[in-house]
Amino acid sequence: MHDSTAAPERVRTRFRERARQFDDLYEDERWLVRTLRPGLFRRRRLAVDTVAGYDQPRVLDVGCGSGRIGEFVLEAGAAHYVGVDFSEPMIDLARARLERFSERMELLVDDFLSARLDGPFEVILAVGLFDYLPEPHRFSRRMFELCAPAGCVVGSFPTWSWLKGPVRKVRYEWIGNCPIFNYSRRELELMFGASGFEPVQVLNPGRSGYLLRAYRP
């Protein structure tokens, strides 16, 4: 499916060195920015709406970054929020941003696949995560293990297009030395279905890629 043996360390290096730049992507919410980067705001809206649909859910945010989405889901009613990211600079930013929620949140610098996490969680967020994973099926399987019955995974996934694909390839892989992976609708249905999720809802709101809700029976 995806192949890049050096991918994890290359991704880790990029997010350690450019934590502030990634955080700034969410800073500007002017109309022009929303028009040029609609995917950032659509996936945040899906995460918030999903959390709001549960009664005080426990939320796990995999690849939580600087806590931008965490702030919104805590405001939306998450009873407890756990953010995990392997970039210490990102977690430092998240800790500062979410300080006012200190009694309801926990932040970990760790590898999701091996981290000790106290589940289950009603909502698991994987927003802006699968873009960088050479072995995504390992993540979907662990998410199933940590997901509560009737719980939900919310994810975002880039897809190849001739409009944005070449630009992202140059920006991330050639200039930034950071791998980037794309997905098809069928690939997502098979991966999450094989992990045990049912139903798997794949939404295609625009050119920026797919949004997903996958439920644990």
At which residue positions do the language-model features occur?
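Conserved class I S-adenosyl-L-methionine
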Residues: M1-A52
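Class I SAM-dependent methyltransferase SAM/SAH-binding core
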Residues: S66-L113
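A conserved beta-strand element that flanks and buttresses the S-adenosyl-L-methionine
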Residues: L125
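Short catalytic micro-motifs in class I SAM-dependent methyltransferases
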Residues: G128-L129
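A short glycine-rich, Lys/Arg-flanked "PGG" loop and its adjoining helix->strand segment in the class I
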Residues: H137-P149
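Conserved beta-strand signature within the Rossmann-like core of class I S-adenosyl-L-methionine
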Residues: A150-F157
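Short, glycine-/aromatic-enriched active-site segment of Class I SAM-dependent methyltransferases
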Residues: T159-P179
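Short alpha-helix
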Residues: P179-S195
